[in-house]
Amino acid sequence: MMAQSKANGSHYALTAIGLGMLVLGVIMAMWNLVPGFSAAEKPTAQGSNKTEVGGGILKSKTFSVAYVLVGAGVMLLLLSICLSIRDKRKQRQGEDLAHVQHPTGAGPHAQEEDSQEEEEEDEEAASRYYVPSYEEVMNTNYSEARGEEQNPRLSISLPSYESLTGLDETTPTSTRADVEASPGNPPDRQNSKLAKRLKPLKVRRIKSEKLHLKDFRINLPDKNVPPPSIEPLTPPPQYDEVQEKAPDTRPPD
């Protein structure tokens, strides 16, 4: 492929150079043939024989240069045409030899092999430059079966409030059901202890906060005794002294 592209480039260069030389030669010939364009045919004031001789020599030189340019351009064009024809023949011969060496039955097999190789290369490139998505990174929007098959540790479940606070809702309900089913049987000590342990923390806190009030009421000596008076830490301000000092502070008239 590289050799073919280089040959095509050389052909294009030859044709361009040949056309340029041909056009330049034609322009020079027309410059000398058409009257009025050449400087030798312009009228001169002196009209001496020297100017006529010089004009004839210049005209002959320009004609010779034009003929050379036209001939070189035509030769380059013919050379480029011949080279292009030769390259086309070589290309056809190579294709014929390839068809003869590789029969038609081997063509589909070779195409399958090429397609398999291309698929493998594409897979390798995709695996090399693979970028995971946000869901894959965060392990979300996956089916449970797929997650368990890949890695059972990936399934994340948040703990409940009861498990964090040490409470369990199933045990109190089960104890209540047992009590309702058998009202004649006395409750077991272990079940009662378990029920005490499984009381909510809020209830415990409220009870503990009200215990000191209960003790205070129980420890009162008698109802006739007045309650203890609570005196403020700082004494109240003396308003009389402030009123007496107020007129003294006024400025004199």
UniProtKB/Swiss-Prot annotation:
Chain positions found as Phosphoserine: 115, 182, 192
A Pfam family of this chain: TMEM51
Lipid bilayer topology: Multi-pass membrane protein
Biased composition (Polar residues): 164-176
Pro residues: bias regions: 224-238
GO cellular component: membrane
Keywords (A to Z) from UniProt: Membrane, Phosphoprotein, Transmembrane, Transmembrane helix
Regions of compositional bias (Basic and acidic residues) in chain numbering: 206-217, 242-253
Chain intervals for the UniProt region annotation (Disordered): 93-133, 164-253
Keyword S-adenosyl-L-methionine attached: no
Top-rank lineage group of the source organism: Eukaryota
Comp. bias (Basic residues): 194-205
Localization per record: Membrane
Record field: transmembrane: 17-37, 65-85
Biased composition (Acidic residues): 113-124
UniProt xrefs under InterPro entries: TMEM51
PANTHER family: TRANSMEMBRANE PROTEIN 51
Name recorded for this polypeptide: Transmembrane protein 51
Protein's organism: Homo sapiens (Human)
Taxonomic classification: Eukaryota, Metazoa, Chordata, Craniata, Vertebrata
Gene: TMEM51
